[in-house]
Amino acid sequence: SWGYNPNHFFAYDKAYGNRNLYKKFIDECHKRGIAVIIDMVFNHATGICPMAKLYWDGNSTAANNPWFNRVAKHPFNVFHDINHEYEGTRKYFKRVLEYWVEEYHVDGYRMDLTKGLTQKNTGDDAGKWSQYDASRIVIIKDYCDAAKSIDPETYFIIEHLGDYSEEKVYAEYGILPWRNMNNSYNQVAMGWASSSN
C-alpha cells in the first residue's frame, strides 16, 4: 500500500489500476503540467514485508534480522523499524528510488519521517532524536543521489522536522526540507491571517 503501512516498495496499491494504466495516468499528468510526487515511507514496514518475514520470531522481527531493528531507535515508530545502516537495506531502497523514476517517470519523492532513518538510539526522547545526526545525513544524501541518478531534476522532499543545523545541510545539498509550513500558508490563503504566524 502507499500509505503509512508499506510492505512492498516496488508495488503500488491495486486501486491505482494495472501497470499500463498507472503509466498512462502519469503521462496524462505530465501533459497537463502536473508533476507526480510519490509519498515514500522508508522508516518502517509492516510484518508482511518480505524482509521482515525472512527473519521472523513469533509476532515480531527476529533479533538477527539485519533489515530491521527489534526495538525501534526513535519515539515515533510504528510497525517494524528499518535498519538503514545495513548495506542490504541501502541497496534495496536506492534501487526503489531509481525504479520509480526510470520505469514510471515520476517526478520525485516526498520522503516521510526521514528523521527516523537512524540507528542512533534515542529511545523515547524526542528532543535527542531531533538533534544533529551525521550518520543520518549520509543515509539521506545517499538516497537523494540514487533518486537523482536517473534524472537530476528529480524532486527530493523530506519531512524531517529536526534540528535546523541538520536541515541546513540538506537544503545546501539540494534536498527540499518540508517544515510543516503549509498550515500558515493555508490560513493566509483562506483570509484568516490573524490566526497565522
Residue ranges and their predicted role:
Residues 105, 133, 138-197:
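Conserved alpha/beta catalytic core and glycan-binding cleft of carbohydrate-active enzymes
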Residues 36-38, 109, 156-158:
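Hydrophobic faces of well-ordered beta-strands that scaffold small-molecule active sites
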Residues 1-105, 113-132, 143-149, 193:
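Substrate-binding/active-site clefts of carbohydrate-active enzymes
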